[in-house]
Amino acid sequence: MQLKDAQLFRQQAYINGEWLDADNGQTIKVTNPATGEVIGTVPKMGTAETRRAIEAADKALPAWRALTAKERSAKLRRWFELMIENQDDLARLMTTEQGKPLAEAKGEIAYAASFIEWFAEEAKRIYGDTIPGHQPDKRLIVIKQPIGVTAAITPWNFPAAMITRKAGPALAAGCTMVLKPASQTPYSALALVELAHRAGIPAGVLSVVTGSAGEVGGELTGNSLVRKLSFTGSTEIGRQLMEECAKDIKKVSLELGGNAPFIVFDDADLDKAVEGAIISKYRNNGQTCVCANRIYVQDGVYDAFAEKLAAAVAKLKIGNGLEEGTTTGPLIDGKAVAKVQEHIEDAVSKGAKVLSGGKLIEGNFFEPTILVDVPKTAAVAKEETFGPLAPLFRFKDEAEVIAMSNDTEFGLASYFYARDMSRVFRVAEALEYGMVGINTGLISNEVAPFGGIKASGLGREGSKYGIEDYLEIKYLCISV
């Protein structure tokens, strides 16, 4: 792999300021999803190494939380600057291990860095309260303190941003963190922690443990020194982790599955709706928890929208993310390909028609697909595809589409396009989702609270609210 700074390609885990192999010497192979080639290996660590990382985090905690907010902020600010300075290398690493086009990878690095920049400033805005006393001789004060040692388990689809959204607020609050990245995409995490080290983040404050999900995750949830876990991934695994954390009453933040509706009303600007659908559906090849999974189009504009969407999809260029001009890379692996094929076959068997795409090209490359006349009984109406499949459902009126949109256990992101302002407010308030994109298909940023309701999770990331999950509220009652 050709990088300007070869030291960013790390094949060891980072624990307590040291680059280490697994105790037993075992490794995990990391492959390029575009070529199938082995990029390298990382240590297959387990319980013992994870425990040492947690103990190092606990040992580093007193000194880190004792720093002033301004001192922690300065170190985070330097980490942000190093990410921007090394954006090209970080993006190339990401594209190689994850597959997304280089332009998207560069965008993710900027997005990931924005959380470090934001929380570097939020570190200095952790305010308490003074409450009027309930008696003349009482003074009531509320302060906020770091929760302690924290843990994070992050996914492969956004291997940099999902880390900084968690590590940024944790470190800003004065907490320490042990991170377990996805085994498919560990190199982005290891490069980020190398830059954190260069930024002056002390040993033990941020460690990265690669290896067995069961053993590493089990120690993170089972070790009583860990006071909070943040996880991004499937609802099934989120439930399991929540159960494991219950033993020690750990604080838990969960960003789980989604099944986002994307609604096009008959008064929408169709060109803008198509533009938003392309961004929402096909960004990262549909492998995002907030991507449009169900596209609902009102009867009067259904055919026109489908035609315009097909024309836009035809312009997408599929290929290796490192090749210039590529807009759509591979899916992460064969299981992801199989899920897309399964949803297409199920929908077609129930009456849907393939308007465009629908076929495997080779390896992990799959054609961006549009299905029309999709019935409500299709699996894709209930299940998250996590791939480049856009199923178009018809609807008659506002009440019908709101009912269909809310008919799911998930509640992460939703989108709709409309011009009528009364409708905008009615629909936005009626949709049972943590986030609503109105006349836009791209809603994620560092200043807004990201998170879902129902089975899509607990807590929020980003924004002024993101740091709250890493703080404990303490009330002081003073007699004067």
From Swiss-Prot:
Catalytic activity: 5-oxopentanoate + NADP(+) + H2O = glutarate + NADPH + 2 H(+)
InterPro entries xrefs: Ald_DH/histidinol_DH (IPR016161), Ald_DH_C (IPR016163), Ald_DH_CS_CYS (IPR016160), Ald_DH_CS_GLU (IPR029510), Ald_DH_N (IPR016162), Aldehyde_DH_dom (IPR015590), Aldehyde_DH_Superfamily (IPR050740), Succ_semiAld_DH (IPR010102)
Entry GO CC: cytosol
Name of the top EC class for this enzyme: oxidoreductase
E.C. numbers: 1.2.1.-
GO biological process: gamma-aminobutyric acid catabolic process; L-lysine catabolic process
Active site: 255 (proton acceptor), 289 (nucleophile)
Any GO MF annotation of the entry: succinate-semialdehyde dehydrogenase (NAD+) activity
Origin superkingdom: Bacteria
Annotated keywords: NADP, Oxidoreductase
Positions that bind NADP(+): 156-157, 180-183, 233-234, 256, 384
Family the UniProt entry places it in: Belongs to the aldehyde dehydrogenase family.
Role, per record: Catalyzes the conversion of 5-oxopentanoate (glutarate semialdehyde) to glutarate. Involved in L-lysine degradation.
Name used for this protein in its record: Glutarate-semialdehyde dehydrogenase
